[in-house]
Amino acid sequence: MLTITAIKAFNDNYIWVLQQQPHTQVYVVDPGDASVVIDYLEANKLTLAGILLTHHHNDHTGGVAELQAYSQNRLSVYGPDNEKIEGITHPLHATAQPRFILDYMSGELQVLDVPGHTAGHIAYVIADALFCGDTLFSGGCGRLFEGTPAQMLNSLQQLAQLPADTRVYCAHEYTLSNLKFALAVNPNNRALQDYNERAIALRRQEKATIPSTIALERAINPFLRASDTEIVDSIKQHFSDLNHANLDELGGFTLLRQWKDNF
């Protein structure tokens, strides 16, 4: 059985721990902080076998060197092949190596190219779990620091095509702020209203809203629904000074991301 556990880091990061029972060797996804990972390993008598990186930002990679030293430089470190990240031992690209097997894990791990937040961002799928870094968030998506709106839209559409029951393990607890924006854009979405209430209740109890699911995100995430009639109408109303005669899905997505950046 694959167990996935969250380690909280910084203000709102999640470092995901993957453990295939009964093995005591584990992998971590995007360890921006080594100290919290080491504390978790030692408290649970686990051995770190490797690291999976989605992109180069320091809050996702900052712990790699210390974890490698802690493990006496025996770690396998997987990450995107076209981003400059210190310590990667196994550079990955979905076209060249779409699937591979991790030691101590059952089944294949799939690599997806999902540029947008950064130019070389990748995501991982193992079993029914998606680790998407800062590409897809619950109720939102990552800012476009390096990629284009077209790249991000394509990446999100690729993720939205995964099986509906796929669990979405993003890297940040941004859900409430994302849902506040989503409700401004899509106020009559009952599924969104219900999810917002559940998310508020979870956060009041200091519980994570993650993982989400692909099915839920298809229903409530405005960035997966940029061509929805109510969302299009909201975009046109918000950007009323623009000519919307030929507003296609990419144009709507671009304006939606611009709106969120300044929300």
From Swiss-Prot:
GO molecular function: hydroxyacylglutathione hydrolase activity; metal ion binding
Recorded superkingdom: Bacteria
Cofactor remark from the record: Binds 2 Zn(2+) ions per subunit.
Keywords from the named record: Hydrolase, Metal-binding, Zinc
Pathway: Secondary metabolite metabolism; methylglyoxal degradation; (R)-lactate from methylglyoxal: step 2/2
Catalytic activity: an S-(2-hydroxyacyl)glutathione + H2O = a 2-hydroxy carboxylate + glutathione + H(+)
Enzyme class: hydrolase
One example of a Gene Ontology biological process annotation: methylglyoxal catabolic process to D-lactate via S-lactoyl-glutathione
Presence of the UniProt keyword Zinc in the record: yes
InterPro entries: Clx_II_MBL, Glyoxalase_II_hydrolase, HAGH_C, Hydroxyacylglutathione_Hdrlase, Metallo-B-lactamas, RibonucZ/Hydroxyglut_hydro
Stretches assigned to coiled coil: none
SUPFAM superfamilies, sorted: Metallo-hydrolase/oxidoreductase (SSF56281)
Cofactor(s) for this UniProt protein: Zn(2+)
Pfam families from the UniProt entry: HAGH_C, Lactamase_B
Family: Belongs to the metallo-beta-lactamase superfamily. Glyoxalase II family.
Function comment: Thiolesterase that catalyzes the hydrolysis of S-D-lactoyl-glutathione to form glutathione and D-lactic acid.
HAMAP family hit by this protein: Glyoxalase_2
Quaternary data: Monomer.
Entry protein name: Hydroxyacylglutathione hydrolase
